[in-house]
Amino acid sequence: MMMFGKISRQLFSLKKIPWSCDSRYFWEWLNTVFNKVDYERIKDVGPDRAASEWLLRCGAKVRYCGHQKWLQDYNKLPGGSVDRYKIQAIDATDSCIMDIGFDHLVGLEHVERITLCRCHYIEDNCLQRLSQLENLRKSLLELEIIACGNVTDNGVIALRHFKNLKYLFLSDLPGIKDKEYLAEVFTKALPSLELKLNLK
C-alpha cells in the first residue's frame, strides 16, 4: 500500500502528463513508472520482498521456496521477517516488466525458474541484463521464453552464460532467424542443457 502511495505522489507531482499522446505511449510511460527501482525500498525490506512488490505490480506471479501456490495479488503479499520468503520461481506471463526494473533481481539468490510469456517489453537487452546477474547465473535451472516478439538471436545467445541451466524452452519468437546456430551455441556452451525449440 505504501508503494502505491509513493507511485501516486510521483504521478501527481508531474507537471505534464502525456494525455494528448496516443494511449500506447501513455501505457508505456505508466509501465515505466511501475518498473522504476526504489533502492531505498530494497534496503528497507530486502531484495525478495522488493522484487515481489515489483513483479506483482507489473502483473507477474511469484512462488516462494517451500510453497506450492503462486502469489499474484499484491494485497496478499506476506508480512513478517524479510528473510522468511525467498522467491524460487517467477511467471511473468502477460506482465509489463522491462529492463529498467531488472535491478530488482540483483539480490535474489534462490530463483530456479523464470517464465517470460507474451512480455511486450522484453527485448534483447533484457536477456543480456539477466545473464549478467551473478546470483541468477548460479541459481537459475529452468527458463521459458514464449511469444516475446522483440527477442532476437542476439538476446537468446546471451543465455549461454547461465552455466547451471538445465532446461530452456523457446517458442513463437519471430525475431529468431537462425535456430540451427542457436542450437549449436547451446550444445557447445551447455552440453547438459535440455533445449526445446518451437520456432519457425
UniProtKB/Swiss-Prot annotation:
Instruction: Give the source's domain of life in one word.
Output: Eukaryota
Which compartment or compartments is the protein found in? Mitochondrion; Mitochondrion inner membrane
Name of the encoding gene: Dmac2l
Q: Provide the residue span(s) of the region labelled N-terminal domain.
A: 1-61
Protein family per UniProt:
Belongs to the ATP synthase subunit s family.
Question: Which terms in the GO cellular component ontology are assigned?
Answer: cytoplasm; mitochondrial inner membrane; proton-transporting ATP synthase complex
Protein known as? ATP synthase subunit s, mitochondrial
What does the entry give for GO biological process?
Answer: ATP biosynthetic process; proton transmembrane transport
Transit peptide, residue positions per record: 1-25
What organism is the protein native to?
Answer: Rattus norvegicus (Rat)
Summarize the protein's role: Involved in regulation of mitochondrial membrane ATP synthase. Necessary for H(+) conduction of ATP synthase. Facilitates energy-driven catalysis of ATP synthesis by blocking a proton leak through an alternative proton exit pathway.
